[in-house]
Every structure is written in structure tokens, then in C-alpha cells.
């Protein structure tokens, strides 16, 4: 248990930041799932629309340190490749 006033404050701040980050990660995952679901359904337009929404979110969270920049790049690359394959097949 924290003894100093500063340590108590840091505990409160850490918990507040954790809850904030959990909410942001959840939102990011939801957008990724929407894009993946549109690809799975074969809906090229919805997939492109969802991809356009998720890219700035991934970039923003990578720059803020919520996720690693390579993870953001990996998600973008894989989604982009799947959408490209879907649009050429259609």
C-alpha cells in the first residue's frame, strides 16, 4: 500500500489511465472486427469503408504508445491485402 501522498496519487492516475486504455483498445478491436467481417462477407465497399475508419485509429494509438507501431502496420497490411484480393476476385 502506498504511504506517501504522491504514491497514492500515482495509484489513482494509473487506474484512471488503465480504464481509459481498456476502452480505447476495445474500440480499436471493434473496428478491426467490423472490417474483418465485411471482408468475410465479401462486401468490398463496406470493407473499404471500415478500413478507412480503422487506419487513422491504428496510427493514432501507435503514435501514443497504446499499441506497438509494428502491430498497427501489421493490421493495416493484412487488411489491405485481403481487401485487394477481394476486389480483384470480384
Swiss-Prot record:
<dbReference type="InterPro" id="IPR036510">
    <property type="entry name" value="Ribosomal_bS20_sf"/>
</dbReference>
<dbReference type="GO" id="GO:0003735">
    <property type="term" value="F:structural constituent of ribosome"/>
</dbReference>
<protein>
    <recommendedName>
        <fullName>Small ribosomal subunit protein bS20</fullName>
    </recommendedName>
</protein>
<dbReference type="GO" id="GO:0005829">
    <property type="term" value="C:cytosol"/>
</dbReference>
<dbReference type="Pfam" id="PF01649">
    <property type="entry name" value="Ribosomal_S20p"/>
</dbReference>
<dbReference type="GO" id="GO:0070181">
    <property type="term" value="F:small ribosomal subunit rRNA binding"/>
</dbReference>
<keyword id="KW-0689">Ribosomal protein</keyword>
<keyword id="KW-0699">rRNA-binding</keyword>
<dbReference type="InterPro" id="IPR002583">
    <property type="entry name" value="Ribosomal_bS20"/>
</dbReference>
<dbReference type="GO" id="GO:0006412">
    <property type="term" value="P:translation"/>
</dbReference>
<keyword id="KW-0687">Ribonucleoprotein</keyword>
<comment type="similarity">
    <text>Belongs to the bacterial ribosomal protein bS20 family.</text>
</comment>
<comment type="function">
    <text>Binds directly to 16S ribosomal RNA.</text>
</comment>
<dbReference type="GO" id="GO:0015935">
    <property type="term" value="C:small ribosomal subunit"/>
</dbReference>
<keyword id="KW-0694">RNA-binding</keyword>
Amino acid at each position: 500500500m502506498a504511504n506517501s501522498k504522491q504514491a497514492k496519487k500515482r495509484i489513482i492516475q494509473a487506474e484512471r489511465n488503465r480504464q481509459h486504455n481498456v476502452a480505447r483498445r476495445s474500440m480499436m478491436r471493434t473496428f478491426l472486427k467490423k472490417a474483418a467481417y465485411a471482408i468475410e462477407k465479401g462486401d468490398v465497399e463496406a470493407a473499404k469503408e471500415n478500413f478507412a475508419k480503422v487506419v487513422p485509429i491504428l496510427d493514432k494509438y501507435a503514435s501514443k504508445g497504446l499499441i506497438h507501431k509494428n502491430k498497427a502496420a501489421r493490421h493495416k497490411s493484412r487488411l489491405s491485402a485481403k481487401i485487394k484480393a477481394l476486389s480483384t476476385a470480384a
